[in-house]
Amino acid sequence: MRAIGRQLNEEADRRDAASRKDPSASTVRRGRLLGRADANAELVLYAEAWSRKIQLNMTFDMVREAAKQPHADPLVTVAVRSDGSVESVAFVRSSGVPAIDEAIRRIVHSQANYQAFSPALLREYDVVEIRRTWHFDMAVRLY
């Protein structure tokens, strides 16, 4: 009986310790491209291909009405998994117009799956975070 009680106490201690861990602590290997330049050429090429896909396959009609409202250029970080699926879309700076922000989320998710990581990129990362400023004029441009 004592052995069972000791085992239950040890399991409870492990659960308590796990619940106190930083929730952002993760074993996922992340690459972050917060601008256009990075020492990792594979990461830059992947992010440029991702941006090109968004810009070339997106019609301005998706945001035309919302973009007529006064708004800021949103700064958005998109996390892409190694298989090309979208992990998250996070706004560093909102456009100030909920319809535009929601349209960006729809655009990002509607064009997934993105290209899977190259073998070189896969050796280093499980997830790549790409940050871009979205600008709407006669088209959608990612800077």
Region spans (language model):
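Surface-exposed patches in mature extracellular/periplasmic domains of secreted proteins
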Residues: M62-A67, A120
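Soluble non-cytosolic domains of exported or imported proteins
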Residues: A37-E48, S95-A99
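Short acidic, glycine/proline-enriched loop segments that cap or flank alpha-helices
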Residues: A66-K68, V92-G96
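Short, small/polar residue-rich loop motifs at catalytic or cofactor-binding pockets
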Residues: Q69-L75
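Conserved "boundary/linchpin" sites in short secondary-structure elements
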Residues: M1-A37, R52-M58, R81-R93, E102-Y143
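Signature of the catalytic double-stranded beta-helix
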Residues: Y46, W50-R52, D61
